[in-house]
From Swiss-Prot:
Belongs to the bacterial ribosomal protein bL25 family. CTC subfamily. Residues 187-217 are annotated as: Disordered. GO terms for biological process: translation. Residues 193-207 have a biased composition (Acidic residues). This is Large ribosomal subunit protein bL25. InterPro entries: Rbsml_bL25/Gln-tRNA_synth_N, Ribosomal_bL25/Gln-tRNA_synth, Ribosomal_bL25_b-dom, Ribosomal_bL25_C, Ribosomal_bL25_long, Ribosomal_L25_dom, Ribosomal_uL5_bac-type. This is one of the proteins that binds to the 5S RNA in the ribosome where it forms part of the central protuberance. GO terms for cellular component: cytosolic large ribosomal subunit. Residues 208-217 have a biased composition (Basic and acidic residues).
Length: 217
């Protein structure tokens, strides 16, 4: 699994709106990193680096975070995950980021991205592949995390569904959804059903006529 890197600075002034606004004007985004064995640490990240990172990662991506003080000395280094991102309602700019530093052997909850590959059998017959979940909430050990879960749908026929219980999750990872929850299904368009029914009726009609002829004879 690819590991991404990010550098941050210790944020000494915390909770003061004026200081936070000044920080943002300077091109930085305030954030915090915390975990089971990590005391909350206030940090600031260069906005351009953060935006670049967001284009490369998901909630399930491991990020190697290094935090330095104002003198450039490293004060913290840990593998982290993005836990929460706050956006400005008007400008949609990133306002704050929470990073979670997991403890080895300690389970955590994330949303695992699902990637569907292949073309379902049912699609070739006119069906439509409906995706009910693009992410799967899971509880997992840090070493079991994958950036995404690939799901092959090529064997799904008309009317067939893929359930949570059908997914092959890494050892140490458990789905938070009911095992009977539908992940994806190949639905049959109503027009296709009508055509099939009409075809059955047409094939049955000659038999009736044939019987009528025999009775007349």
């Amino acid at each position: 699994m690819e590991k991404h890197t990010l550098e941050a600075l210790v944020r000494s002034v915390v909770g003061k709106k004026r200081a936070v606004r000044r920080l943002r004007r300077q091109g930085f985004v305030p954030g915090v990193v915390y975990g089971p064995d990590v005391e909350p640490l206030s940090i600031s990240i260069k906005r351009s680096n953060l935006i670049k990172l967001f284009h490369e990662v998901t909630e399930a991506s491991i990020i190697s975070l290094t935090v330095k003080d104002e003198n450039g000395k490293e004060v913290f280094s840990h593998d982290v995950f993005i836990k929460n991102v706050q956006y400005d309602k008007l400008t949609d700019e990133v306002k704050h980021v929470d990073f979670y530093a997991p403890e080895k052997g300690h389970k955590m909850k994330i949303n695992l991205p699902l990637e569907f590959v292949g073309k379902a059998k049912g699609e070739e017959k006119g069906g439509v592949l409906e995706i009910h979940h693009h992410e799967l909430p899971v509880e997992t050990l840090p070493n079991a995390v994958v950036e995404k879960l690939e799901i092959d749908v090529s064997n799904l026929d008309l009317g067939q569904a893929l359930y949570v219980k059908d997914l092959k999750l890494p050892e140490g990872m458990e789905a938070e959804l009911d095992e009977e929850e539908i992940i994806a299904i190949v639905s049959t368009p109503s027009g296709l059903e009508v055509e099939e029914e009409t075809g059955e009726e047409e094939s049955a009609e000659p038999e009736v006529i044939e019987k009528g002829k025999k009775e007349e004879e």
